[in-house]
UniProtKB/Swiss-Prot annotation:
Auxiliary subunit of the mechanotransducer (MET) non-specific cation channel complex located at the tips of the shorter stereocilia of cochlear hair cells and that mediates sensory transduction in the auditory system. The MET complex is composed of two dimeric pore-forming ion-conducting transmembrane TMC (TMC1 or TMC2) subunits, and aided by several auxiliary proteins including LHFPL5, TMIE, CIB2/3 and TOMT, and the tip-link PCDH15. Functionally couples PCDH15 to the transduction channel. Belongs to the LHFP family. The chain crosses the membrane at residues 25-45, 99-119, 129-149, 179-199. It holds the Pfam family L_HMGIC_fpl. Forms the MET channel composed of TMC (TMC1 or TMC2), TMIE, TOMT, CIB (CIB2 or CIB3), LHPL5 and PCDH15. Interaction with PCDH15 is required for efficient localization to hair bundles. Keywords: Cell membrane, Disease variant, Ion transport, Membrane, Transmembrane, Transmembrane helix, Transport. This is LHFPL tetraspan subfamily member 5 protein. The gene is Lhfpl5. It comes from the Eukaryota. GO terms for cellular component: apical plasma membrane; plasma membrane; stereocilium bundle; stereocilium tip. Residues 46-98, 150-178 are extracellular.
Length: 219
């Protein structure tokens, strides 16, 4: 006959395994958050949101704030734009998209900075703060991706992609990897946010009520 463990001893074993698993998931979440921040910074900086194809009148590509368009007289690309040079950004929609993606980037970086709070604050509270920041970052990325195509009717984009180009119509151009990555990043941010919320609420209640009750009865 199998001998059952006392309630308190079983609770201690459960508690140890529970904490170990929570820490493992927390380390995984933290690592993924750091990797995700690098990804968001890359898609913010890189000017490869849309670009030319074999059918476009000239070569080039556009990002959130910078772009390069081929010279009609030569094969060289003329590049313009910068995050602080708002006058060179082709359209208001691009400026708006840049703002929201930048906001998402800073929120993700902010959630990484919040890791230092684990040493001085309640663990559950820190997880929840990071979760809300990552949820807000997902919202910023979503708004940026939705607004960005509204600027495709700008003269600079039409010059490269053809006269058929308009709002949410890319003409002869194609979507590049940075834009696709930004769309996928929305889901990544939502998953990280969900994990942080789960970790936060798990920290609020490390032991189930039935184990606590059994322990009290044993005493």
């Amino acid at each position: 006959m199998v001998k059952l463990l006392p309630a308190q001893e079983a609770a201690k074993i459960y508690h140890t395994n529970y904490v170990r698993n929570s820490r493992a998931v927390g380390v995984m979440w933290g690592t993924l958050t750091i990797c995700f921040s690098v990804l968001v910074m890359a898609l913010f900086i890189q000017p490869y949101w849309i670009g030319d194809s074999v059918s476009t009148p000239q070569a080039g590509y556009f990002g959130l704030f910078s772009y390069c368009v081929g010279n009609v007289l030569s094969s060289e690309l003329i590049c313009k734009g910068g995050p602080l040079d708002f006058s060179s950004i082709p359209s208001r929609a691009f400026k708006t998209a840049m703002f929201f993606v930048a906001l998402a980037m800073f929120l993700i970086i902010g959630s990484i900075i919040c890791f230092s709070l684990f040493f001085v604050c309640n663990t559950a509270t820190v997880y929840k703060i990071c979760a809300w920041m990552q949820l807000a970052a997902a919202t910023g990325l979503m708004i940026g991706c939705l607004v960005y195509p509204d600027g495709w009717d700008s003269s600079e984009v039409r010059r490269m992609c053809g006269e058929q180009t308009g709002k949410y119509t890319l003409g002869h151009c194609t979507i590049r990897w940075a834009f696709m990555l930004a769309i996928l990043s929305i889901g990544d941010a939502l998953i990280l946010s969900f994990l942080a919320f789960v970790l936060g609420y798990r920290q609020d209640k490390l032991l189930p009520d039935d184990y606590k009750a059994d322990g009290n009865e044993e005493v």
